[in-house]
């Protein structure tokens, strides 16, 4: 998949500026999208990129100067290092001596989290965060992680989707059941636009969310079909990756296996397939 080229700094609307995390890679695409939100002299920063990326800190400083603004507070969409990792550098290089909060949803089950000598201010589903020109509503959307947050930007009928939905490709997840529920929740928002955690802005928001839901259902059917066509045989998860993800580049097979394993666990819970140890874990159809 060839990726769109994204500038390191871009004003996306009158109240949203994207600052690219300068950390491109197979899992981060063009890099983590971080966003300055609002229209005033103090704005909200959503996500912070990875640790020790001086190019990102330089881009963020440039954005603050260009738009004559400062950071009111930080919101991180989830605990992954490519979203929280820049907090220490921002605290030291941009916010030194400033009093500001770093907001996120708590881990589930709860665990104490400390980053860069800061304690998080924990939010809850439905909380409202405001700054001049922007109103954000917290949406608890677990699945990618247990603490995942999306944010509704009321003024634009838009969603900051974190890693629940990407601008290109599909997302990985920890819990497929929760992830599907979160996609349904976002679909019900009837948003017009998505500002994703990675990749370009999505303008056909509802179509994209429906595409994600349909994609996961289709993957499930492919797994069941592969097992049913070989009834009596058992397969390792990587065997199934090579069948189901045959059009996916091999360097992404480990990530694909991660997703496929969650499909297998869901299908096992539903009694459609069974797991056997011989000596590695293998799967067969019950249908």
UniProtKB/Swiss-Prot annotation:
- Cellular location of this protein? Mitochondrion matrix
Cite a single GO MF annotation.
single-stranded RNA binding
Essential cofactor(s): Zn(2+)
Q: Where does Zn(2+) 1 bind?
A: 78, 80, 144, 163
Cofactor remark: Binds 2 Zn(2+) ions per subunit.
Keywords from the UniProt entry = Endonuclease, Hydrolase, Metal-binding, Mitochondrion, Nuclease, RNA-binding, Zinc
List the Pfam families hit by this protein, alphabetically: BLACT_WH, Lactamase_B
- InterPro entries (UniProt xref): LACTB2-like_MBL-fold, LACTB2_WH, Metallo-B-lactamas, RibonucZ/Hydroxyglut_hydro, Sec-metab_biosynth-thioest, WH-like_DNA-bd_sf
The protein's Enzyme Commission number:
3.1.27.-
Q: List the disulfide bonds.
A: none
SMART domains assigned to the protein according to its UniProt record, in alphabetical order: Lactamase_B
* Any GO CC annotation of this UniProt entry: mitochondrial matrix
Residues annotated as binding Zn(2+) 2 are 82-83, 163, 198
Known function:
Endoribonuclease; cleaves preferentially 3' to purine-pyrimidine dinucleotide motifs in single-stranded RNA. The cleavage product contains a free 3' -OH group. Has no activity with double-stranded RNA or DNA. Required for normal mitochondrial function and cell viability.
- Family designation: Belongs to the metallo-beta-lactamase superfamily. Glyoxalase II family.
- What name does this protein carry? Endoribonuclease LACTB2
Species classification: Eukaryota, Metazoa, Chordata, Craniata, Vertebrata
Annotated gene: lactb2
């Amino acid at each position: 998949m060839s990726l769109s080229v994204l500038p390191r700094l871009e004003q996306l609307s009158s109240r949203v500026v994207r600052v690219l995390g300068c950390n491109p890679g197979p899992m981060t695409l063009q890099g983590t999208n971080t966003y300055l939100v609002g229209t005033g002299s103090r704005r909200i920063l959503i996500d912070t990129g990875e640790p020790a990326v001086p190019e990102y800190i330089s881009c963020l400083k440039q954005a603050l100067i260009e738009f004559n603004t400062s950071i009111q507070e930080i919101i991180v969409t989830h605990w992954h290092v490519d979203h929280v990792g820049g907090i220490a550098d921002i605290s030291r290089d941009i916010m030194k001596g400033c009093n500001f909060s770093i907001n996120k949803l708590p881990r589930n089950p709860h665990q104490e989290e400390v980053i860069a000598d800061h304690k998080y201010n924990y939010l809850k589903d439905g909380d409202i965060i405001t700054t001049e020109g922007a109103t954000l509503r917290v949406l608890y959307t677990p699945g990618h992680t247990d603490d995942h947050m999306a944010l509704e930007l009321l003024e634009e009928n838009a969603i900051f989707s974190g890693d629940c939905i990407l601008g290109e490709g599909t997302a990985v997840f920890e819990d497929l059941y929760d992830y599907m529920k979160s996609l349904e929740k976002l679909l019900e928002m009837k948003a017009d636009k998505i500002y994703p955690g990675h990749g370009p802005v999505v303008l056909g928001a509802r179509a994209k969310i429906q595409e994600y839901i349909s994609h996961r259902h289709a993957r499930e059917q492919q797994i069941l079909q592969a097992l049913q066509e070989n009834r009596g045989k058992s397969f390792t998860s990587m065997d199934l990756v090579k069948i189901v993800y045959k059009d996916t580049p091999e360097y992404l097979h480990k990530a694909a296996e991660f997703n496929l394993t969650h499909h297998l666990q869901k299908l096992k819970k539903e009694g459609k397939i069974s797991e056997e140890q011989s000596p590695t874990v293998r799967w067969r159809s019950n249908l």
